[in-house]
Amino acid sequence: MKVIVSENAQQLGKKAAELTAQYLREAIAEKGSARIILSTGASQFTTLEALVKEDVDWSKVEMFHLDEYVNLPQDHPASFVRYLKERFVEKTGGLKAVHFVDTSIGTDAIIEKLTGELKEAVVDVGLIGIGENAHVAFNDPPADFENQASYIVVQLDADCRKQQLGEGWFPTIDDVPRQAVSMTVSQILK
């Protein structure tokens, strides 16, 4: 593992974007396409802003979405689908494929759909942060590292919900959803 220390968020985001673009270009050169998993949250702002400016043939990149609240409309300011559309998808000029966690079709249906799509090929790179309470995606501590499913429905704990409130995504704690569909730890580690 290589640790990179940066002076600020802009510098860190730019470096993360450069490395990610390099991995994507290498995968495209080797296999003809690349697959990326994207997460959301304030920690990704500078990285995604810099990544869409990188020299990558986005038409050969398939994007997977890490997690999404259950029953939150996609036009809600806190929707991760909206976040990724506005900050990434719409700025790439067109991706090979986009696999959103669209909970509007039902949790069982989206989990089955995404699981099938994930199994088609290896994911080349993931941009995944760690939350204030040490959650990865919506796998709050103590997460189940043994669950071999690709995606699951999770109950959001109080600390996770407080983080979402604190970041300004929701006006009150009661507005923060209590469930989400999340990629599992075992899938993230693949």
Question: What do these predicted regions represent?
Answer:
Residues 1-36, 108:
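N-terminal glycine-/serine-/threonine-rich phosphate-binding loop
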Residues 17-25, 52, 85-89, 115-119, ...:
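Generic structural signal for well-ordered alpha-helical scaffold segments
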Residues 25-54:
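Glycine-rich N-terminal segment of FAD-binding domains in flavoprotein oxidoreductases
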Residues 40, 188-190:
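Short, intrinsically disordered, charge-balanced linker/junction segments flanking boundaries
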Residues 51-54, 77-80, 113-114, 136, ...:
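Short, glycine/charged-enriched secondary-structure capping and boundary segments
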Residues 58-127, 175, 188:
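Ligand-binding beta-strand-loop-alpha-helix segment within the catalytic cores
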Residues 121-146:
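Glycine-rich phosphate-binding loop
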Residues 137-185:
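Class I SAM-dependent methyltransferase SAM-binding "motif I" and its flanking Rossmann-like core
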